[in-house]
Protein backbone atom coordinates (compact mmCIF):
# COMPACT_ATOMS: atom_id res chain seq x y z
CA UNK A 1 0.00 0.00 0.00
CA UNK A 2 1.37 3.39 -1.02
CA UNK A 3 2.36 5.84 1.71
CA UNK A 4 2.69 9.60 1.83
CA UNK A 5 6.47 9.11 1.58
CA UNK A 6 6.05 7.23 -1.72
CA UNK A 7 3.95 10.07 -3.12
CA UNK A 8 6.44 12.71 -1.98
CA UNK A 9 9.36 10.85 -3.51
CA UNK A 10 7.72 10.36 -6.90
CA UNK A 11 6.39 13.93 -6.99
CA UNK A 12 9.77 15.34 -6.02
CA UNK A 13 8.52 17.22 -2.95
CA UNK A 14 8.92 16.89 0.80
CA UNK A 15 6.58 14.72 2.85
CA UNK A 16 5.10 17.79 4.54
CA UNK A 17 4.45 19.45 1.17
CA UNK A 18 2.79 16.29 -0.15
CA UNK A 19 0.56 16.12 2.93
CA UNK A 20 -0.44 19.78 2.64
CA UNK A 21 -1.11 19.40 -1.09
CA UNK A 22 -3.44 16.44 -0.52
CA UNK A 23 -5.33 18.49 2.06
CA UNK A 24 -5.65 21.50 -0.31
CA UNK A 25 -3.56 23.80 1.85
CA UNK A 26 -3.75 27.23 0.15
CA UNK A 27 -0.05 27.82 0.85
CA UNK A 28 0.78 25.14 -1.70
CA UNK A 29 0.55 26.22 -5.33
CA UNK A 30 -2.29 24.91 -7.45
CA UNK A 31 0.20 23.27 -9.83
CA UNK A 32 1.89 21.37 -7.00
CA UNK A 33 -1.45 20.28 -5.55
CA UNK A 34 -2.57 18.90 -8.91
CA UNK A 35 0.76 17.13 -9.43
CA UNK A 36 0.72 15.49 -5.99
CA UNK A 37 -2.92 14.41 -6.37
CA UNK A 38 -2.15 12.90 -9.77
CA UNK A 39 0.70 10.88 -8.28
CA UNK A 40 -1.55 9.79 -5.40
CA UNK A 41 -4.15 8.59 -7.90
CA UNK A 42 -1.53 6.68 -9.91
CA UNK A 43 -0.31 4.95 -6.75
CA UNK A 44 -3.89 4.24 -5.60
CA UNK A 45 -3.13 6.02 -2.33
CA UNK A 46 -5.71 5.58 0.44
CA UNK A 47 -5.47 8.29 3.12
CA UNK A 48 -5.56 7.28 6.77
CA UNK A 49 -8.68 9.15 7.85
CA UNK A 50 -8.42 7.85 11.39
CA UNK A 51 -4.94 9.29 11.81
CA UNK A 52 -6.06 12.60 10.32
CA UNK A 53 -8.96 12.80 12.73
CA UNK A 54 -6.79 11.95 15.72
CA UNK A 55 -4.48 14.78 14.72
CA UNK A 56 -7.49 17.12 14.84
CA UNK A 57 -8.51 15.70 18.23
CA UNK A 58 -11.60 13.83 17.02
CA UNK A 59 -12.51 10.24 16.19
CA UNK A 60 -13.67 8.86 12.86
CA UNK A 61 -17.15 8.21 14.24
CA UNK A 62 -20.53 9.86 13.73
CA UNK A 63 -22.95 9.80 16.64
CA UNK A 64 -26.54 8.84 15.83
CA UNK A 65 -28.92 10.20 18.47
CA UNK A 66 -32.34 8.54 18.67
CA UNK A 67 -35.40 10.15 20.25
CA UNK A 68 -36.13 9.14 23.84
CA UNK A 69 -37.36 5.55 23.59
CA UNK A 70 -38.90 3.37 26.28
CA UNK A 71 -37.69 -0.19 26.74
CA UNK A 72 -41.00 -1.59 25.47
CA UNK A 73 -41.28 0.67 22.41
CA UNK A 74 -41.29 -1.17 19.06
CA UNK A 75 -38.31 -0.79 16.73
CA UNK A 76 -38.96 1.92 14.16
CA UNK A 77 -38.42 0.64 10.59
CA UNK A 78 -37.84 4.23 9.45
CA UNK A 79 -34.83 4.56 11.75
CA UNK A 80 -33.41 1.25 10.56
CA UNK A 81 -33.59 2.37 6.93
CA UNK A 82 -32.09 5.74 7.89
CA UNK A 83 -29.11 3.88 9.36
CA UNK A 84 -28.69 1.82 6.21
CA UNK A 85 -28.43 5.02 4.17
CA UNK A 86 -26.05 6.60 6.66
CA UNK A 87 -23.82 3.53 6.74
CA UNK A 88 -23.51 3.42 2.94
CA UNK A 89 -22.57 7.12 2.85
CA UNK A 90 -20.02 6.84 5.69
CA UNK A 91 -18.21 3.81 4.27
CA UNK A 92 -16.17 5.64 1.59
CA UNK A 93 -15.28 8.29 4.18
CA UNK A 94 -13.98 5.55 6.52
CA UNK A 95 -16.27 6.72 9.31
CA UNK A 96 -18.25 4.45 11.62
CA UNK A 97 -21.55 4.90 13.48
CA UNK A 98 -22.01 5.01 17.23
CA UNK A 99 -25.54 5.13 18.66
CA UNK A 100 -27.13 6.94 21.61
CA UNK A 101 -30.48 5.51 22.80
CA UNK A 102 -31.97 6.18 26.23
CA UNK A 103 -35.34 5.95 28.04
CA UNK A 104 -35.30 9.58 29.25
CA UNK A 105 -33.75 12.96 28.30
CA UNK A 106 -31.27 12.97 31.19
CA UNK A 107 -29.70 9.65 30.22
CA UNK A 108 -29.71 10.56 26.54
CA UNK A 109 -27.79 13.79 27.21
CA UNK A 110 -25.33 11.92 29.43
CA UNK A 111 -24.71 9.42 26.63
CA UNK A 112 -24.01 12.20 24.13
CA UNK A 113 -21.69 13.98 26.56
CA UNK A 114 -19.77 10.74 27.04
CA UNK A 115 -19.39 10.38 23.27
CA UNK A 116 -17.90 13.86 23.07
CA UNK A 117 -15.61 13.82 26.09
CA UNK A 118 -14.48 10.19 26.15
CA UNK A 119 -14.81 8.97 22.56
CA UNK A 120 -13.99 12.32 20.89
CA UNK A 121 -17.09 12.19 18.68
CA UNK A 122 -17.54 15.64 17.12
CA UNK A 123 -20.09 14.88 14.37
CA UNK A 124 -23.72 13.97 15.02
CA UNK A 125 -26.94 13.12 13.20
CA UNK A 126 -30.03 13.74 15.35
CA UNK A 127 -33.03 11.54 14.51
CA UNK A 128 -35.66 13.96 15.83
CA UNK A 129 -36.53 17.63 16.29
CA UNK A 130 -38.21 19.12 19.34
CA UNK A 131 -38.41 22.41 21.20
CA UNK A 132 -36.09 22.95 24.17
CA UNK A 133 -34.08 19.83 23.38
CA UNK A 134 -31.14 19.48 25.82
CA UNK A 135 -29.03 17.41 23.40
CA UNK A 136 -28.97 19.91 20.54
CA UNK A 137 -28.58 22.75 23.06
CA UNK A 138 -25.42 21.02 24.34
CA UNK A 139 -24.08 20.50 20.81
CA UNK A 140 -24.69 24.16 19.96
CA UNK A 141 -23.03 25.36 23.15
CA UNK A 142 -19.88 23.39 22.37
CA UNK A 143 -19.94 24.30 18.66
CA UNK A 144 -20.06 20.68 17.53
CA UNK A 145 -21.05 19.65 14.02
CA UNK A 146 -24.55 18.20 13.74
CA UNK A 147 -27.50 17.82 11.37
CA UNK A 148 -31.07 17.00 12.38
CA UNK A 149 -33.30 14.60 10.46
CA UNK A 150 -36.56 16.52 10.24
CA UNK A 151 -37.53 20.17 10.18
CA UNK A 152 -36.05 22.16 13.08
CA UNK A 153 -38.23 24.19 15.40
CA UNK A 154 -38.71 27.89 14.75
CA UNK A 155 -36.60 28.78 17.79
CA UNK A 156 -33.47 27.02 16.49
CA UNK A 157 -32.69 27.14 12.74
CA UNK A 158 -30.38 24.11 12.84
CA UNK A 159 -29.00 22.49 9.69
CA UNK A 160 -31.35 19.73 8.55
CA UNK A 161 -32.46 17.20 5.97
CA UNK A 162 -36.15 16.41 5.61
CA UNK A 163 -39.08 15.71 3.34
CA UNK A 164 -41.66 18.38 2.64
CA UNK A 165 -44.12 16.90 5.13
CA UNK A 166 -46.79 19.53 4.52
CA UNK A 167 -46.74 18.67 0.82
CA UNK A 168 -46.75 14.94 1.67
CA UNK A 169 -49.80 15.41 3.91
CA UNK A 170 -51.58 17.21 1.08
CA UNK A 171 -50.66 14.53 -1.46
CA UNK A 172 -51.75 11.61 0.74
CA UNK A 173 -55.13 13.22 1.44
CA UNK A 174 -55.59 14.14 -2.22
CA UNK A 175 -55.05 10.51 -3.24
CA UNK A 176 -57.84 9.33 -0.93
CA UNK A 177 -60.22 11.98 -2.24
CA UNK A 178 -59.51 11.62 -5.95
CA UNK A 179 -58.75 7.89 -6.23
CA UNK A 180 -61.08 6.46 -3.62
CA UNK A 181 -63.90 8.99 -3.60
CA UNK A 182 -63.38 9.71 0.09
CA UNK A 183 -65.19 12.80 1.41
CA UNK A 184 -64.68 12.58 5.18
CA UNK A 185 -61.17 11.27 5.90
CA UNK A 186 -59.86 11.50 9.47
CA UNK A 187 -56.24 12.32 10.29
CA UNK A 188 -54.70 10.13 13.03
CA UNK A 189 -51.63 11.16 15.04
CA UNK A 190 -49.91 10.19 18.28
CA UNK A 191 -50.47 13.53 19.99
CA UNK A 192 -46.77 13.63 20.93
CA UNK A 193 -46.31 16.98 19.13
CA UNK A 194 -43.63 15.68 16.80
CA UNK A 195 -42.83 18.29 14.15
CA UNK A 196 -43.33 15.85 11.27
CA UNK A 197 -46.80 14.85 12.51
CA UNK A 198 -47.85 18.48 12.85
CA UNK A 199 -46.60 19.25 9.33
CA UNK A 200 -48.46 16.28 7.80
CA UNK A 201 -51.61 17.31 9.67
CA UNK A 202 -51.23 20.85 8.30
CA UNK A 203 -51.01 19.40 4.79
CA UNK A 204 -54.13 17.32 5.42
CA UNK A 205 -56.01 20.41 6.62
CA UNK A 206 -54.90 22.43 3.59
CA UNK A 207 -56.15 19.73 1.22
CA UNK A 208 -59.49 19.52 3.04
CA UNK A 209 -59.88 23.29 2.86
CA UNK A 210 -59.09 23.23 -0.86
CA UNK A 211 -61.90 20.71 -1.40
CA UNK A 212 -64.22 22.58 0.98
CA UNK A 213 -64.46 19.53 3.23
CA UNK A 214 -64.45 19.48 7.06
CA UNK A 215 -61.21 18.41 8.75
CA UNK A 216 -61.55 15.62 11.32
CA UNK A 217 -58.61 14.73 13.56
CA UNK A 218 -57.90 12.12 16.23
CA UNK A 219 -54.90 12.10 18.58
CA UNK A 220 -53.95 9.07 20.64
CA UNK A 221 -53.05 11.15 23.69
CA UNK A 222 -56.23 13.23 23.56
CA UNK A 223 -59.18 11.34 22.10
CA UNK A 224 -59.06 7.93 23.73
CA UNK A 225 -60.26 4.69 22.16
CA UNK A 226 -60.13 4.81 18.35
CA UNK A 227 -63.11 2.46 17.89
CA UNK A 228 -65.31 4.56 20.14
CA UNK A 229 -64.23 7.65 18.21
CA UNK A 230 -65.05 6.08 14.83
CA UNK A 231 -68.38 4.80 16.14
CA UNK A 232 -69.25 8.36 17.20
CA UNK A 233 -68.34 9.60 13.71
CA UNK A 234 -70.04 7.25 11.21
CA UNK A 235 -69.49 9.84 8.47
CA UNK A 236 -65.75 9.03 8.39
CA UNK A 237 -65.01 7.14 5.17
CA UNK A 238 -61.20 7.16 5.01
CA UNK A 239 -58.04 7.42 7.14
CA UNK A 240 -54.80 9.38 6.85
CA UNK A 241 -52.38 7.95 9.45
CA UNK A 242 -49.35 9.97 10.58
CA UNK A 243 -46.89 7.07 10.46
CA UNK A 244 -46.53 3.30 10.31
CA UNK A 245 -45.73 2.81 14.00
CA UNK A 246 -49.04 4.40 14.98
CA UNK A 247 -50.90 2.38 12.36
CA UNK A 248 -49.29 -0.82 13.62
CA UNK A 249 -50.62 -0.04 17.10
CA UNK A 250 -54.14 0.65 15.78
CA UNK A 251 -54.32 -1.94 13.01
CA UNK A 252 -56.46 -4.57 14.76
CA UNK A 253 -59.06 -1.90 15.59
CA UNK A 254 -59.06 -0.24 12.17
CA UNK A 255 -59.44 -3.51 10.24
CA UNK A 256 -63.00 -3.78 11.54
CA UNK A 257 -64.05 -0.68 9.55
CA UNK A 258 -62.43 -1.62 6.21
CA UNK A 259 -61.77 2.01 5.20
CA UNK A 260 -59.38 3.31 2.51
CA UNK A 261 -56.10 4.26 4.19
CA UNK A 262 -53.13 6.50 3.39
CA UNK A 263 -50.13 5.97 5.67
CA UNK A 264 -46.65 7.44 5.89
CA UNK A 265 -43.51 5.29 5.54
CA UNK A 266 -43.42 2.55 2.94
CA UNK A 267 -41.86 0.05 5.34
CA UNK A 268 -42.06 -3.74 5.18
CA UNK A 269 -44.46 -3.51 8.12
CA UNK A 270 -46.84 -1.46 6.00
CA UNK A 271 -46.42 -3.82 3.09
CA UNK A 272 -47.68 -6.68 5.27
CA UNK A 273 -50.50 -4.75 6.96
CA UNK A 274 -51.74 -2.63 4.08
CA UNK A 275 -51.90 -4.54 0.82
CA UNK A 276 -54.31 -2.12 -0.84
CA UNK A 277 -53.44 1.24 0.65
CA UNK A 278 -51.77 4.47 -0.35
CA UNK A 279 -48.27 4.33 1.16
CA UNK A 280 -46.13 7.47 1.26
CA UNK A 281 -42.48 6.48 0.82
CA UNK A 282 -40.34 9.11 2.56
CA UNK A 283 -37.16 7.47 1.21
CA UNK A 284 -35.32 7.14 4.54
CA UNK A 285 -32.18 5.67 2.96
CA UNK A 286 -31.85 8.73 0.75
CA UNK A 287 -32.51 10.92 3.80
CA UNK A 288 -29.67 9.18 5.65
CA UNK A 289 -27.28 9.63 2.74
CA UNK A 290 -28.26 13.28 2.40
CA UNK A 291 -27.68 13.76 6.13
CA UNK A 292 -24.09 12.53 5.84
CA UNK A 293 -23.43 14.68 2.78
CA UNK A 294 -24.74 17.76 4.60
CA UNK A 295 -22.82 16.92 7.78
CA UNK A 296 -19.52 17.22 5.90
CA UNK A 297 -20.53 20.20 3.76
CA UNK A 298 -20.61 23.21 6.06
CA UNK A 299 -21.48 25.58 3.20
CA UNK A 300 -24.97 24.11 2.85
CA UNK A 301 -27.76 24.65 5.41
CA UNK A 302 -30.42 22.09 4.47
CA UNK A 303 -31.57 19.57 1.89
CA UNK A 304 -35.03 18.25 1.04
CA UNK A 305 -35.55 14.69 -0.17
CA UNK A 306 -38.60 13.97 -2.31
CA UNK A 307 -41.27 11.44 -1.37
CA UNK A 308 -43.16 8.90 -3.49
CA UNK A 309 -46.66 7.44 -3.12
CA UNK A 310 -47.35 3.77 -3.83
CA UNK A 311 -50.65 1.93 -3.92
Functional labels for PLM-detected ranges:
Residues 91-102, 156, 186-187, 201, ...:
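Short beta-strand elements in bilobed, periplasmic/extracellular small-molecule ligand-binding domains
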Residues 127-167, 245, 265-277:
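Flexible loop/hinge segments that line or gate small-molecule binding clefts
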Residues 172-213, 301-311:
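An alpha-beta-alpha
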Residues 46-108:
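Amphipathic helical "hinge" segments at domain boundaries
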Residues 97-118, 170, 216-233, 248:
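Structural motif
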Residues 1-60:
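N-terminal helix-turn-helix DNA-binding module of bacterial transcription factors
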Residues 227, 231-311:
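Flexible loop/turn connectors
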Residues 161-187, 222-227, 281-300:
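Hydrophobic alpha-helical segments within soluble ligand-binding/sensing domains
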Amino acid sequence: MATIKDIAQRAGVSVSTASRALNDNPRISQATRLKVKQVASELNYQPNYNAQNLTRGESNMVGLVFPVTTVTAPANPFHIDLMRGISSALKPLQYEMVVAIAPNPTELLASVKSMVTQSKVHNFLIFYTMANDPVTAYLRKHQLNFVVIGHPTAQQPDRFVDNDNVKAGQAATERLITRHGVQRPVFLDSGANWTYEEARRDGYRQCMTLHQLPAITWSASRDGDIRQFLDRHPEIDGIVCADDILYGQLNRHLQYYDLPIACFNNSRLMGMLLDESERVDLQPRELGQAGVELLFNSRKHHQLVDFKIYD
